[in-house]
Amino acid sequence: MRQATGFLEFRTERQGLLDITREVAEWADAQGVREGLLTLFCRHTSASLIVQENAAPAARRDIEAYFARIAPEDAHAYEHDEEGPDDMPAHLRATLTQVQLSIPLIGGRMALGTWQGIYLFEHRRRPHRRTLALHLAGE
């Protein structure tokens, strides 16, 4: 069995979903593994990872709006507010989603469905550099 590890860095410009499918696929392809399991891990507490609809922008807008409703930016609602009104809601949104994904590689390609994409979900308003750790095991 072969293993590969690495990091991918992304610069987010704002809150919302950033499609990172292409960059992840390129990294996995460069490892030369045909059959295996790819794990992605987001090294942050105010960003997360999701697999979601990649064809309809309205679906992404609805997801972003939903999280804005269930974890609103209200400075008076949270005790933890040292970094601004978007800080604690960002932590809550990351908690409600996930910071790691496991995706099978079959025939050298990620086994995503036709309409699935991998998204980095930025929960803070201002730009950030986000780092993902990747691990690929297989043959």
Provide a role label for each language-model segment.
Residues 1-139:
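Active-site histidine-anchored catalytic micro-motif
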